[in-house]
């Protein structure tokens, strides 16, 4: 009964603009948030943009925050099997019953926005609204929010984040975001904003942006945005770094230089050196969120526990043995290169067969 109701809601939402069709405006989602009483202001936010590594980084941040006994909401996209995967609460997908209930609660307000807009709300905009309403309903302490596409005009960007994260920027979605790394980085950096309550003596006077390793062209644009809005900056390779990654059964052992100090012998149940780098970014984001600084690290045992529980479905995920079978969501050359390097480093297959399915708008030759 619950799954049938979920399917009916999904069918209803599929009649809206598809997620790949975006308009450079936050007007509709802002109107919905206003009508709902601003649920997006009821929790702290770590906001994550970038081309590759967003979902894995978001899931690691989520796992770390829960290890520190925070109630966490998680927004990721797209889903692999069921739409409820996109909205996580306390480490679990939202229950279909709650998904359907909250949709029916916000539906009249969505229809009010539709009536006042030139075009109706897109499916993605509605899902973002549903996510933020679900987090306020739960309620959660902090939301880890993965950008859907770009950053500046992404519907998730109605939040004012405590910590913004930019994972590696590469060429993807060039028809929407621009043809150069600088243009794409400019769109991603749109999530870096000045702190709304900077004059409040009880809050930090700046937001923090955590930046993964970047091509110099992209890094210049991201840093300029941080300077323009007076955000604090933590860069991979400067303020923090993945120092060492050793192959281990079921994943890898990682040493990370964090913002607060050295975190050694961390077991990460994910494969590939790129995931060690994602882990360093995730840890820096959580350190920034809690205010860790040089000489004042987070509790190492809790950090180890958080990373040990991390999962990232569809990212070099082993789904069977005999024969060993992995699935991976790489869909651009940068992601495919990381996948190839991980297979080469972490495994020793005598024979490897790749089965690829690539959308027409992707760089199939590069992949």
Language model segments and positions:
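Acidic, Mg2+-coordinating active-site environments of NTP-dependent enzymes
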Residues: 113-115, 139-146, 161-265, 279, ...
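Cofactor-binding loop segments of dinucleotide-utilizing enzymes, especially the Rossmann-like FAD-
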Residues: 77, 214, 356-360
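N-terminal leader/targeting and accessory segments in enzymes
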Residues: 1-52, 56-71, 80-81, 139, ...
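Active-site catalytic microenvironments for nucleophilic, acid-base chemistry
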Residues: 35, 64-68, 134, 285-292, ...
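Short catalytic-loop micro-motif centered on adjacent basic/acidic residues
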Residues: 118-122, 209-212, 326-327, 353-355
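ATP-dependent carboxylate-amine ligase catalytic core
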Residues: 20-22, 26, 30-41, 67-159, ...
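Nucleotide phosphate-binding/pyrophosphate-handling subdomain across enzymes
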Residues: 142-147, 154-165, 169-173, 183, ...
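Aromatic/hydrophobic pocket-lining residues that form π-stacking "cages" and hydrophobic walls in ligand
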Residues: 61, 131, 222
